């Protein structure tokens, strides 16, 4: 069997393995604003709920909107398996992406993900 055939089979197997591992566990249960929601008013905070208490020291949240990254402050937990942070600058109409990173419970793994929400024009 030639080298190209073996190499092709190897690449195919690696691709199958990567597909099988793409359905990875995520500790995120829900969020405020809701994942994929269209809001009637601009949020002043972000709050993400996990299946176990997140480690704040190993966590970060980012909010990216139509005008770039928003300033956030005061990442903390309310002891409800959550992370909460204040949005400093005004959230205007448009599409937003929340990027999160955290470690939860006794699990040594660090997890990450993104979700979107939108703020429509007034009157919509």
Map each language-model feature to its residues.
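Bacterial N-terminal signal peptides that target proteins for export
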Residues: 1-9
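Acidic, low-complexity Ser/Thr/Gly/Pro-rich repeat segments typical of extracellular/periplasmic
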Residues: 25-28, 37-41, 45-124
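Short, solvent-exposed loop/edge segments of extracellular or virion-exposed proteins
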Residues: 31-33
């Amino acid at each position: 069997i030639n080298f190209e055939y073996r190499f092709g089979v190897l690449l195919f197997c690696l691709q199958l393995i990567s597909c099988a591992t793409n359905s990875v566990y995520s500790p995120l249960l829900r969020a405020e604003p809701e994942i994929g929601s269209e809001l009637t008013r601009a949020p002043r905070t972000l709050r993400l709920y996990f299946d176990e208490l997140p480690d704040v020291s190993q966590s970060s949240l980012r909010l990216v909107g139509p005008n770039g990254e928003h300033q956030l402050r005061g990442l903390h937990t309310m002891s409800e398996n959550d992370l909460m942070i204040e949005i400093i600058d005004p959230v205007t109409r448009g599409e937003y992406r929340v990027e999160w990173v955290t470690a939860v419970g006794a699990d040594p793994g660090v997890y990450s993900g993104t979700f979107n929400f939108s703020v429509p024009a007034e009157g919509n």
